[in-house]
C-alpha cells in the first residue's frame, strides 16, 4: 500500500497562492471524480482550509520504482485542476509518502502543524474532509479501502489521545481566546453573565464565537456602524442571544455588563473611568471585567484603579499568550512522542493486515485447486475408472499444484541468497537447508 500527501500550507505559500488552490465542497467532488478517472488513486481525501490545502492519496499497487513518477503525475494533476502551472507552485507544493505521510496527517489533525499551535478546529476539518470522501465513494459503490479508513480512524483516536494526555489545547494562544480564558478564570460560570463587546471586526467575531460556545447568557455588540454589527450577528450560531447596540448606547450596555471586551479602531478613548463608575453604581458594585484589546486603547487606563474592577490590556494578554505558547511547545513535544508511537502501531497493523490478506488468498486459491481436481476425480469414478488409479492421480496432481508456487519462491530465494526465508521454510519442514 502506498500513501501520498501533496499540498501547500501557511508555511510554504502566501494567502494569494492558498486562495488559488482552495477546494469548495463542489470542487472537491469534481476532484475526487478526476482522481478516479485518471486512475491516480483508489481513494483520496481532500483537506481544504484557509491555511492549507492537502490531498491524501491511497493506492495499493504502486511499485517502489514507480513512486516518484506517480507523485509527479499527482502534482501535475493538482496544478491543472486549479488552472496553474507547476512552476507557479514551485517552492510551495510539498509531498510525503507512506510513513512520513502518515506522520504528517497525524501532526495536522493534532494541531501541531497549525498556524496557532494546538488549535482544535483542524481536527473537525479533517473529519469533515474524510466524511465527504466516504460519502462520495459510497455513492460510487466503491467504499474507501479498509486500510485508508483505518488510517483516518487511527488519526482521530491519536488526536483524542493527544488532547487527553497533553496540555496542547489547555492554554490560550490567541487574543480572542485569551480574553475568554480570563473571563472563565474570574467568574465561576459564564452562563449567567451579560457581555458587552465593543467593535465588529475579526477579533470581536472570534471572541463572540468563543463566548457563545461557552453558553454566555447574553451578548451585546456595540459598534459605530450599526449595520456592520448586524451583519456580524447573521454569521453566528446562537444569534438569538445577541443584541446590537449603537455606539451612543454604550453607557446603557456598560450598566448591564459583567464583562466588557473592546477592540475598535477608534483614535480616542471610548470608555472612561466616569462611565465605569456610573455602571458600577447601576450594578451595585458587582465585579466587572474589562478587557481592552485595541491599539490605541479604547478604555481609559485609570479604570483599573476602581474597586471590583478587573482591567486588562492587550499587553497583559500578550504576556499570558507568550507564557502559554511555551507551555504548548512543551505539550507539542509530548504529543510528537505519542504520534510516533501511534504511527508505528498503524504500520504494524498494516503489515499484519496485508499478510493476512495474502494468506487468505493463498488458502482460497488452494481450495479452488482442490475443488477442480476433486470434481475431475469424481467424474472419473462415475465413468468407471479404477478407483485406486483415480486417487493416485488426484494426490499426484494436488501435490504438484499446491507445491508449484512455494517451489518457485524457494528457487527465487536460493538465487537471491535469502537465507532467512529459506530458514523459515526449513523450520516448517523440520529439515535442515544446506
UniProtKB/Swiss-Prot annotation:
Keyword tags: NADP, Oxidoreductase, Porphyrin biosynthesis
Keyword set includes Oxidoreductase: yes
Pathway listed: Porphyrin-containing compound metabolism; protoporphyrin-IX biosynthesis; 5-aminolevulinate from L-glutamyl-tRNA(Glu): step 1/2
Binding site for substrate: 49-52, 114, 119-121, 125
Pfam families named in the record: GlutR_dimer, GlutR_N, Shikimate_DH
Catalytic reactions on record: (S)-4-amino-5-oxopentanoate + tRNA(Glu) + NADP(+) = L-glutamyl-tRNA(Glu) + NADPH + H(+)
Gene3D superfamilies referenced in this protein's UniProt entry, alphabetically: Glutamyl-tRNA reductase, N-terminal domain (3.30.460.30), NAD(P)-binding Rossmann-like Domain (3.40.50.720)
Binding sites annotated in the UniProt record for NADP(+): 199-204
Keyword hit for Oxidoreductase: yes
Active site location: 50 (nucleophile)
GO molecular function list: glutamyl-tRNA reductase activity; NADP binding
Record site: Important for activity: 104
EC number annotated for this UniProt entry: 1.2.1.70
Record InterPro entries: 4pyrrol_synth_GluRdtase, 4pyrrol_synth_GluRdtase_dimer, 4pyrrol_synth_GluRdtase_N, GluRdtase_CS, GluRdtase_dimer_dom_sf, GluRdtase_N_sf, NAD(P)-bd_dom_sf, Shikm_DH/Glu-tRNA_Rdtase
GO biological process terms on file: protoporphyrinogen IX biosynthetic process from glutamate
Further comment: During catalysis, the active site Cys acts as a nucleophile attacking the alpha-carbonyl group of tRNA-bound glutamate with the formation of a thioester intermediate between enzyme and glutamate, and the concomitant release of tRNA(Glu). The thioester intermediate is finally reduced by direct hydride transfer from NADPH, to form the product GSA.
Family affiliation: Belongs to the glutamyl-tRNA reductase family.
Assembly mode: Homodimer.
Protein purpose: Catalyzes the NADPH-dependent reduction of glutamyl-tRNA(Glu) to glutamate 1-semialdehyde (GSA).
HAMAP family: Glu_tRNA_reductase
Domain notes: Possesses an unusual extended V-shaped dimeric structure with each monomer consisting of three distinct domains arranged along a curved 'spinal' alpha-helix. The N-terminal catalytic domain specifically recognizes the glutamate moiety of the substrate. The second domain is the NADPH-binding domain, and the third C-terminal domain is responsible for dimerization.
Identification of the protein by name: Glutamyl-tRNA reductase
Organism: Pasteurella multocida (strain Pm70)
Source organism phylogeny: Bacteria, Pseudomonadati, Pseudomonadota, Gammaproteobacteria, Pasteurellales
Gene this chain is encoded by: hemA
Amino acid at each position: 500500500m502506498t500513501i501520498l500527501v501533496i499540498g501547500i500550507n501557511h508555511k510554504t505559500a502566501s494567502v494569494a497562492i492558498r486562495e488559488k488552490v482552495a477546494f469548495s465542497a463542489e470542487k472537491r467532488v469534481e476532484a475526487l471524480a478526476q482522481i478516479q478517472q485518471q486512475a491516480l488513486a483508489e481513494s483520496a481525501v481532500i483537506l481544504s482550509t484557509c491555511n492549507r490545502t492537502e490531498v491524501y492519496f491511497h493506492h495499493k499497487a504502486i511499485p517502489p520504482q514507480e513512486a516518484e513518477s506517480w507523485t509527479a503525475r499527482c502534482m501535475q494533476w493538482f496544478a491543472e485542476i486549479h488552472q496553474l502551472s507547476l512552476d507557479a507552485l514551485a517552492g510551495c507544493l510539498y509531498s510525503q509518502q507512506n510513513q512520513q505521510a502518515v506522520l504528517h496527517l497525524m501532526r495536522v489533525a493534532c494541531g501541531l502543524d497549525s498556524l496557532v499551535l494546538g488549535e482544535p478546529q483542524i481536527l473537525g476539518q479533517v473529519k469533515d474532509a474524510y466524511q465527504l470522501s466516504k460519502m462520495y465513494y459510497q455513492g460510487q459503490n466503491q467504499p474507501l479501502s479498509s486500510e485508508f479508513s483505518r488510517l483516518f480512524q487511527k488519526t482521530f483516536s491519536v488526536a483524542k489521545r493527544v488532547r487527553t494526555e497533553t496540555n496542547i489545547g489547555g492554554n490560550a494562544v490567541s487574543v480572542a481566546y485569551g480574553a475568554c480564558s480570563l473571563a472563565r478564570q474570574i467568574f465561576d460560570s459564564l452562563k449567567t453573565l451579560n457581555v458587552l463587546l465593543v467593535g465588529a471586526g475579526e477579533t470581536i467575531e472570534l471572541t463572540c464565537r468563543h463566548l457563545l460556545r461557552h453558553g454566555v447568557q447574553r451578548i451585546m455588540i456595540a459598534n459605530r456602524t450599526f449595520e456592520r454589527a448586524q451583519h456580524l450577528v447573521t454569521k453566528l450560531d446562537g444569534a438569538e442571544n445577541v443584541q446590537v447596540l449603537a455606539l451612543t448606547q454604550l453607557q446603557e450596555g456598560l450598566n448591564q455588563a459583567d464583562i466588557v471586551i473592546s477592540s475598535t479602531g477608534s483614535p480616542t478613548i471610548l470608555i472612561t473611568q466616569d462611565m465605569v463608575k456610573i455602571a458600577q453604581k447601576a450594578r451595585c458594585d458587582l465585579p466587572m471585567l474589562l478587557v481592552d484589546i485595541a491599539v490605541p486603547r479604547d478604555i481609559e487606563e485609570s479604570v483599573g484603579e476602581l474597586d471590583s474592577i478587573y482591567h486588562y490590556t492587550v499587553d497583559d494578554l500578550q504576556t499570558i499568550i507568550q507564557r502559554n505558547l511555551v507551555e504548548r511547545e512543551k505539550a507539542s513535544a509530548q504529543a510528537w512522542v505519542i504520534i510516533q508511537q501511534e504511527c508505528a502501531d498503524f504500520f504494524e497493523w498494516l503489515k499484519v493486515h496485508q499478510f493476512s490478506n495474502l494468506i487468505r488468498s493463498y488458502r482460497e486459491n488452494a481450495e479452488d485447486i482442490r475443488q477442480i481436481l476433486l470434481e475431475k476425480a469424481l467424474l472419473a469414478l462415475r465413468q468407471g475408472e479404477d478407483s485406486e488409479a483415480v486417487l493416485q492421480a488426484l494426490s499426484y496432481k494436488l501435490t504438484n499444484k499446491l507445491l508449484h508456487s512455494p517451489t518457485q519462491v524457494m528457487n527465487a530465494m536460493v538465487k537471491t541468497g535469502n537465507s532467512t526465508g529459506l530458514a523459515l521454510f526449513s523450520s516448517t519442514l523440520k529439515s535442515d537447508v544446506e
